[in-house]
Amino acid sequence: MALAAARRLLLHAGSRLGRREAVDGARRFANKRVLVETEGPAGVAVMKLRNPPVNSLSLECLTEFTISLEKLENDKSIRGVILTSECPGIFSAGLDLLEMYGRNPAHYAEYWKNVQELWLRLYTSNMILVSAINGASPAGGCLLALCCDYRVMADNPKYTIGLNESLLGIVAPFWFKDMYVNTIGHREAERALQLGTLFSPAEALKVGVVDEVVPEDQVHSKARSVMTKWLAIPDHSRQLTKNMMRKATADNLIKQREADIQNFTSFISKDSIQKSLHMYLEKLKQKKG
């Protein structure tokens, strides 16, 4: 309950959260974990995740992300957003496992509600969303990219992307699955979800997880050129088409939100799942050590 109240307070204070300043004709506002730079005449904002070391989507990060996105949605001068990372070598490691391990059911429910909220806002946004994937993008990081209208990925063999939840001993929910199927087709999604496949840039391009792979130093310039192409389309026709393509998938979650939260809370609270998460987190500690 306290978490929910804190989030409502932050959202209510969204217009005051973070600092605003003008930089070389551009406007910017920043929260602790998200930096947004906007270019008024161009109608484009660049949203940078900066939650080091790996841009994990903690409850605080999800809240700040949602607030930043809400600000941009309410700014009628902004037509498109380029989503990228400020952390070297990582786009986003996805959901924060520490939010799903060793907590109480109320925390799990609140966390999952925030994950749902961010996904719905991204996936149904009227703005043009282009992801400049400049690092590794597993699990929830891949989810963020899949929400975008176009995905540009750096051609670096060290970077991978995919919904690899099964490798962690957890299951991607139905709305992750639905979006994956929409993007790469049923058979590819079925195989990738069961195996927890992390695709190299070339493999991701081949199956359709990303739309373009470019040299690492060209990711942002390519994202901008792609954005220019999309901005040439009248907003009303593009937005109606996007809504037509995505509404059924979004509605499928909307009508089952509470049940999905209950299912997640029940699943993640199981001793066997907590044990799997513990083992995975211990492996991560050993790698860091």
From Swiss-Prot:
Residues with site note (Important for catalytic activity): E165
EC number: 5.3.3.8
Residues with the N6-succinyllysine modification: K48, K71, K222, K229, K255, K270, K275, K283
GO biological process: fatty acid beta-oxidation
UniProt KW Transit peptide keyword: yes
UniProt keyword list: Acetylation, Fatty acid metabolism, Isomerase, Lipid metabolism, Mitochondrion, Transit peptide
Transit peptide: 1-28
Name the record gives this protein: Enoyl-CoA delta isomerase 1, mitochondrial
Biological source species: Mus musculus (Mouse)
Lineage, highest ranks first: Eukaryota, Metazoa, Chordata, Craniata, Vertebrata
Gene responsible for this protein: Eci1
